[in-house]
A protein has these predicted regions:
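N-terminal targeting or regulatory segments adjacent to alpha/beta-hydrolase or S9 domains
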Residues: 1-63, 94
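Short, surface-exposed "cap/lid" segments of acyl-processing enzymes
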Residues: 47, 52-59, 63-140
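Catalytic nucleophile loop
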Residues: 103, 133, 168-183
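Short, well-ordered alpha-helices that flank and scaffold nucleotide-derived cofactor binding pockets
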Residues: 121, 185-189
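Conserved acidic catalytic loop of the alpha/beta-hydrolase fold
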Residues: 139-141, 151-168, 180-185
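Short, solvent-exposed loop/turn segments at secondary-structure boundaries
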Residues: 143-145
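Phosphate/oxyanion-binding active-site loops and adjacent basic polyanion-contact surfaces
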Residues: 148-152, 175-176
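A conserved short beta-strand
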Residues: 171, 190-192
Length: 192
């Protein structure tokens, strides 16, 4: 990727030159298409930073409850994040402890789990929330080996066992539906 950096910067400059309103290049035939091609090259080559979840609190029954994000389990290809709600009110704390638990299994590829922050924020109102945070495959050392479907299923099973509660709901978003169904089916067949 570092070798592509000069081309990425060049593509960004080209897109701006062919689309800037005060540039004479915009008057040339095909300028819009050229700008679009440069923009595409730029977007394919640029580095996208992983945004933060940024959930520090959630309003429950009109009262703001602080939320702390923490890594609950870490594996080479994924981290299991927990969003823990806090309260100084004993009654509210008791209610929070009685809430059901949900594991959100985010897609492995295509985007970061942080795009589900609104889903997590909404679930936090009346659930204990965990979410999978998959590691970019480029960042996993090659000695960890490949990550196949059976590994994916095993990760989901490990996360479910780690959470280990009687009232657990699992929500898969798009692509992980098949591995999640396989994981819970295998666990159910074993009586887990």
């Amino acid at each position: 990727r570092a070798g592509l950096a000069p081309y990425t910067y060049f593509a960004d400059a080209g897109a701006k030159m062919y689309s800037a309103q005060d540039s004479w290049l915009t008057a040339l035939p095909g300028a819009q298409r050229t700008a679009a091609a440069f923009e595409l090259m730029y977007r394919l080559g640029k580095e996208y930073e992983k945004p933060e979840f940024g959930i520090h609190g959630v309003e429950i029954d009109g009262v703001e409850c602080p939320v702390v994000e923490r890594v609950d389990m870490s594996k080479p290809f994924c981290r299991l994040l927990r969003f823990k709600r806090y309260s100084d009110n004993e009654d509210r704390l008791r209610d929070l402890k009685d809430d059901p638990t949900v594991l959100v299994v985010a897609p492995l590829s295509g985007h970061h789990a942080t795009l589900l922050r609104d889903t997590v924020r909404t679930l936090l109102i009346d659930h204990k929330v965990y979410i999978t945070d998959w590691t970019d495959a480029r960042m996993v050392p090659a000695e960890q080996g490949p990550f196949r479907l059976d590994d994916y299923v095993a990760y989901v099973q490990d996360f479910i066992r780690h959470i280990g509660c009687d009232n657990l709901h699992v929500v898969s978003v798009c692509q992980p539906t098949v591995p999640v169904l396989a994981a819970v089916s295998l666990m159910a067949a074993r009586g887990e």
